[in-house]
Amino acid sequence: MRYLTSGESHGPQLTVIVEGIPANLEIKVEDINKEMFKRQGGYGRGRRMQIEKDTVEIVSGVRNGYTLGSPITMVVTNDDFTHWRKIMGAAPISEEERENMKRTITKPRPGHADLVGGMKYNHRDLRNVLERSSARETAARVAVGALCKVLLQQLDIDIYSRVVEIGGIKDKDFYDSETFKANLDRNDVRVIDDSIAQAMRDKIDEAKNEGDSIGGVVQVVVENMPVGVGSYVHYDRKLDGKIAQGVVSINAFKGVSFGEGFKAAEKPGSEIQDEILYNSEIGYYRGSNHLGGLEGGMSNGMPIIVNGVMKPIPTLYKPLNSVDINTKEDFKATIERSDSCAVPAASIVCEHVVAFEIAKALLEEFQSNHIEQLQQQIADRRQLNVEF
């Protein structure tokens, strides 16, 4: 399975083509739009989300509510394009018109793709870089992940996410799955402890008032995975490697870990390895889950726990020092409309990116043309965990 996105932040639309979704999967566009709406929320978001009403239009690959097995094309319209029609349109404009619109960018932002992207593609107007490197593209990725979540639901696989930390303020390390799921989206920073939520809001307000931004840590949990998805045989087939690549490909994500993650470096092996147990009804399982459901590059049947680190957004309303690429003189970096904190929204993006990686790995493990074939193969693998 694979997908390709296209579109600029202030262009007319985002387009995504997904290939490899099995036939006969029931799809309701409102289920996808429900996930799209979640991405737009979260405390600390900027004015852009007051303009956009992200909804998906499916233009191929689905007929009368069911997938065909052919590529699925989805379109997300950028409502803000009405304010950018001339500057972001395909038709040529004069340099005078461009200058009068004051949309040309020559002062790159530290921490963004602006300068290096301009060098790589020889763009003297850095807007050509930031329009594509913008996190607006993640709307298309959430649409893909929403499709994958529908697929996973048909396989009895749950996936959900939360915020673990914002600006150094931390929620509890982990909750049991029932508490986790019962309290999803109970507040606008996506943590479970409401007292922690208010402290995070205060931290976000403080950063906003100072013209600054803050980052944090998000967590994604995948439950009821069949064992043995991935491989120990080759490096490029390891499931944790694939998930890690997906997570750090999200805008502003700088790190990823599984289970207890970097805390494993502080403990002896006897406190980190998960003991193997057996029950005649469910088969093999682990007495703990320090490793986050992954052993030897494969799923072991325990919940897969993924932690992603998001740096603060690089656009600052009190900008850092930069250099004008035309004059080479010192200037403050360009200010673009932005969020002060996008960690709650990023947890939704991360959830959907992981959903794609999980669905892709399942379809590589159990090659299937239609959903019924996939369901049978996964049922057989789950039975193997009991009978082996």
Curated annotation (Swiss-Prot):
<feature type="binding site">
    <location>
        <begin position="132"/>
        <end position="134"/>
    </location>
    <ligand>
        <name>FMN</name>
    </ligand>
</feature>
<comment type="subunit">
    <text>Homotetramer.</text>
</comment>
<dbReference type="GO" id="GO:0009423">
    <property type="term" value="P:chorismate biosynthetic process"/>
</dbReference>
<comment type="pathway">
    <text>Metabolic intermediate biosynthesis; chorismate biosynthesis; chorismate from D-erythrose 4-phosphate and phosphoenolpyruvate: step 7/7.</text>
</comment>
<dbReference type="GO" id="GO:0004107">
    <property type="term" value="F:chorismate synthase activity"/>
</dbReference>
<keyword id="KW-0456">Lyase</keyword>
<comment type="function">
    <text>This reaction introduces a second double bond into the aromatic ring system.</text>
</comment>
<dbReference type="Pfam" id="PF01264">
    <property type="entry name" value="Chorismate_synt"/>
</dbReference>
<keyword id="KW-0028">Amino-acid biosynthesis</keyword>
<comment type="similarity">
    <text>Belongs to the chorismate synthase family.</text>
</comment>
<feature type="binding site">
    <location>
        <begin position="251"/>
        <end position="252"/>
    </location>
    <ligand>
        <name>FMN</name>
    </ligand>
</feature>
<keyword id="KW-0274">FAD</keyword>
<feature type="binding site">
    <location>
        <position position="296"/>
    </location>
    <ligand>
        <name>FMN</name>
    </ligand>
</feature>
<dbReference type="GO" id="GO:0008652">
    <property type="term" value="P:amino acid biosynthetic process"/>
</dbReference>
<keyword id="KW-0057">Aromatic amino acid biosynthesis</keyword>
<dbReference type="GO" id="GO:0005829">
    <property type="term" value="C:cytosol"/>
</dbReference>
<keyword id="KW-0285">Flavoprotein</keyword>
<dbReference type="InterPro" id="IPR020541">
    <property type="entry name" value="Chorismate_synthase_CS"/>
</dbReference>
<keyword id="KW-0521">NADP</keyword>
<feature type="binding site">
    <location>
        <position position="337"/>
    </location>
    <ligand>
        <name>FMN</name>
    </ligand>
</feature>
<feature type="binding site">
    <location>
        <begin position="311"/>
        <end position="315"/>
    </location>
    <ligand>
        <name>FMN</name>
    </ligand>
</feature>
<protein>
    <recommendedName>
        <fullName>Chorismate synthase</fullName>
        <ecNumber>4.2.3.5</ecNumber>
    </recommendedName>
</protein>
<feature type="binding site">
    <location>
        <position position="45"/>
    </location>
    <ligand>
        <name>NADP(+)</name>
    </ligand>
</feature>
<keyword id="KW-0288">FMN</keyword>
<dbReference type="GO" id="GO:0010181">
    <property type="term" value="F:FMN binding"/>
</dbReference>
<dbReference type="GO" id="GO:0009073">
    <property type="term" value="P:aromatic amino acid family biosynthetic process"/>
</dbReference>
<dbReference type="InterPro" id="IPR035904">
    <property type="entry name" value="Chorismate_synth_AroC_sf"/>
</dbReference>
<dbReference type="InterPro" id="IPR000453">
    <property type="entry name" value="Chorismate_synth"/>
</dbReference>
<feature type="binding site">
    <location>
        <position position="39"/>
    </location>
    <ligand>
        <name>NADP(+)</name>
    </ligand>
</feature>
